[in-house]
From Swiss-Prot:
Gene for this chain: Lyzl1
Protein name, per record: Lysozyme-like protein 1
GO terms under cellular component: extracellular region
UniProt GO molecular function: lysozyme activity
Segment forming the signal sequence: 1-19
Lineage of the organism: Eukaryota, Metazoa, Chordata, Craniata, Vertebrata
Entry-listed glycosylation sites: N58
Main location (coarse class): secreted
Domain C-type lysozyme: 20-148
Catalytic reaction(s) noted: Hydrolysis of (1->4)-beta-linkages between N-acetylmuramic acid and N-acetyl-D-glucosamine residues in a peptidoglycan and between N-acetyl-D-glucosamine residues in chitodextrins
Record's keyword annotation contains Disulfide bond: yes
């Protein structure tokens, strides 16, 4: 029985090790380099604010919704419309596996987020942004981060 407990502890450490929670400034640099500053007319602070309220900058965040779909990754991108998981009848507009949205490499998540902003009503897709960031001063989000 003791070995089962030790095994469970090892597994939990390996799961935690795979999760990455970025700092605000590290994410600001990644987002700026990826061209998110002013993408779709939204300043960098909007992206940082949205990612904070959607996932607290956690790349492996997953939330199962009442309709059975799942929101994935740092931007909480939904499986029903934007990515492909094991469920059928998904639109997969980003042409990406949902698992690609929960890795430390943010490339697929950023490309998909750009597509969402371009093909929907801007950042209104994200409830976290609407409730906490819309029509607010976004300059504080990048303050002290050495990004222009």
């Amino acid at each position: 029985m003791k070995s089962v407990g030790v095994f469970a502890l090892i597994i939990s450490f390996s799961i935690v090790a795979e999760s990455k929670i970025y700092t605000r400034c590290k994410l600001a640099k990644i987002f700026a380099k990826a061209g998110l500053d002013n993408y779709g007319g939204f300043a960098l602070g909007n992206w940082l604010c949205m990612a904070y309220y959607e996932s607290h900058y956690n790349t492996t965040a997953e939330n199962v919704l009442e309709d059975g779909s799942t929101d994935y990754g740092i931007f909480q991108i939904n499986s029903f419309t934007w990515c492909r998981n094991a469920r059928k009848h998904q639109k997969n507009h980003c042409h990406v596996a949902c698992s690609a949205l929960i890795t430390d490499d943010l490339t697929d998540a950023i490309l998909c987020a750009k597509k969402i902003v371009k093909e929907t009503q801007g950042m209104n897709y994200w409830q976290g942004w609407k409730k906490n960031c819309e029509n607010k001063d976004m300059s504080e989000w990048k303050r002290g981060c050495e990004v222009s």
